[in-house]
Swiss-Prot record:
Protein name, as recorded: Taxane 13-alpha-hydroxylase
Pfam families cross-referenced by the UniProt entry: p450
Similarity field: Belongs to the cytochrome P450 family.
Keywords per UniProt: Heme, Iron, Metal-binding, Monooxygenase, Oxidoreductase, Taxol biosynthesis
Length: 485
């Protein structure tokens, strides 16, 4: 066991062990493509490819380093080999468009099987074709703009309560753990209707273990992160199965309504063709949404606070906008769904934060036919990877890309080149919860500036770490808070 533990510390040895058979097979398969013009690049060693360099880059404060080094050497399309798969990385808006606009024509979604075991193979990300349409339609019943209006007040009051109870009254706070607690509290209430803090805490802890395991070496051996994640996923499934059955009984008894939360919506969903969801699909999509809403919302909220701490003039403009909205209200009247449209500058600040610090790195696809692009052939069966970093942080698409400039998103980003700004993905696979995330982020910003007149990072130069993705402050972003009188 000590030797195995050493492997977890030495990923270079471990990846050689894990990828040896797949690497040999893929090496000889690649010989069959010698007659076609493949993109430039390096497949690395037959056994491990360039997996080590890729993983090392993702775990750093600059996850884009792997991509940028090869872009400068090979251009906007290059080949590599990642986790045993020959992969073509497509950069720039043209490459993004190819990958994101050709679902089921040229490409299909493709995630590592080890990750799908933790998220759930019957979730939206694991579906294609008609099955993808059915599951997406079910989720839209809850996550679409029309449905979100029904949950606006509940989300707003939950965020306000969290800030009042866990932020206000403090001179200092560490942002990341508080944001994680807030995001999970909102998700558990709106997804499951869970209000018991002990159950929220149990689910929260399980999810943390699963998230760490999702980005670890996939060894299902006691003591390893992936094994712990598999066990946590099984426990999570048991709890969620119980919640599903309990809610089904409540719906039958008339003590729960069809639209009170996501669980009820999915249990009662039937589309125009009579399709509904099996319990396994409901369970796996809950798991996916917990991952998505938790991990990809933690980053925007945390980095939003980091950015505003460095730009007090933007914080003041956000506060002025929010208090301007409140000035139109009667005494004691809370903000409403329609007020989100008036948060124009606040949303520009959020958009610029998402541009500079994308909540997702990118996603993989698999070529379902030979693809001809820019004079090269991408063979059927190869993986394709698009990334947010190939455009969102590039000077050629965003002038002064390293500077925080919310004004670039004035007029709803009409001056932004298509397929250069993709913080939630795009095409058929755009994140189904992006409107949910937008509402949550703007409500958090609203209640935060109401409570605090300003903030200051205790360490403005705090480093970021991508373990796991996306990169976040290594110490959780300690800040000083200045309460409003």
């Amino acid at each position: 066991m000590d030797a195995l533990k050493q492997l977890e510390v030495s990923p270079s040895i471990l990846f050689v062990t894990l990828a040896v058979m797949a690497g040999i097979i893929l090496f000889f398969r690649s010989k069959r493509h010698s007659s076609v013009k493949l993109p430039p690049g390096n497949l690395g060693f037959p056994l491990v490819g360039e997996t080590l360099q890729f993983v090392r880059s993702l775990g750093s404060s600059t996850p884009q380093q792997f991509i940028e080094e090869r872009m400068s050497k090979f251009g906007d399309v290059f080949k590599t080999s990642i986790i045993g798969h020959p992969t073509v990385v497509l950069c720039g808006p043209a490459g993004n468009r190819l990958v994101l606009s050709n679902e089921n024509k040229l490409v299909q979604m493709s995630w590592p099987s080890s990750m799908m075991k933790l998220i759930g193979e019957d979730c939206l990300g694991g579906k294609t074709g008609e099955q993808h349409r059915i599951v997406r339609a079910a989720l839209t019943r809850f996550l679409g703009p029309q449905a979100l209006q029904n949950h606006f007040a509940k989300m707003s009051s939950g965020i306000q309560r969290h800030i009042n109870e866990k932020w206000k009254g403090k001179d200092e706070a560490t942002v990341l753990p508080l944001v994680k607690d807030l995001v999970f509290s909102v998700a558990s209430r709106l997804f499951f209707g869970i209000t018991e803090e002990h159950l929220q805490e149990q689910l929260h802890n399980l999810l943390e273990v699963i998230l760490v395991g999702s980005f670890s070496v996939p060894l299902n051996i006691p003591g390893f992160s992936y094994h712990k994640a598999i066990q946590a996923r099984a426990t999570l499934a048991d709890i969620m199965t119980h919640l599903i059955e309990k809610r089904r009984n409540e719906l039958r008894a008339g003590t729960a309504s069809e639209n009170q939360d996501l669980l009820s919506v999915l249990l009662t969903f039937t589309d125009e063709r009579g399709n509904s969801l099996a319990d396994k699909e409901i369970l796996d999509n809950f798991s996916m949404l917990l991952h998505g809403s938790y991990d990809s919302t933690n980053s925007p909220l945390t980095m939003l606070i980091k950015v505003l701490a460095s730009h007090p003039e933007s914080y003041e403009k956000v506060a002025q906008e929010q208090f301007g909205i409140l000035s139109t209200k009667m005494e004691g009247e809370e903000i409403a769904w329609k007020d989100l449209k008036e948060m124009k500058y606040s949303w520009q600040v959020v958009q610029e934060t998402l541009r500079m610090y994308p909540p997702i790195f990118g996603t993989f696809r698999k070529a379902i036919t030979d693809i001809h692009y820019n004079g090269y052939t991408i063979p059927k069966g190869w993986k394709l990877l698009w990334t947010t970093y190939s455009t969102q942080t590039k000077e050629e698409y965003f002038k002064d890309a390293d500077q925080f400039k919310p004004s670039r998103f004035e007029e709803e980003g009409k001056h932004v080149t298509p397929y250069t700004y993709l913080p939630f993905g795009g095409g058929m696979r755009v994140c189904p919860g992006w409107e949910f995330a937008k509402m949550e982020t703007l409500l958090f910003l609203h209640h935060f500036v109401k409570a605090f007149s300003g903030l200051k990072a205790i360490d403005p130069n705090e480093k970021l770490s991508g373990k796991p993705l996306p990169p976040l402050p290594v110490n959780g972003l300690p800040i000083k808070l200045y309460s409003r009188s």
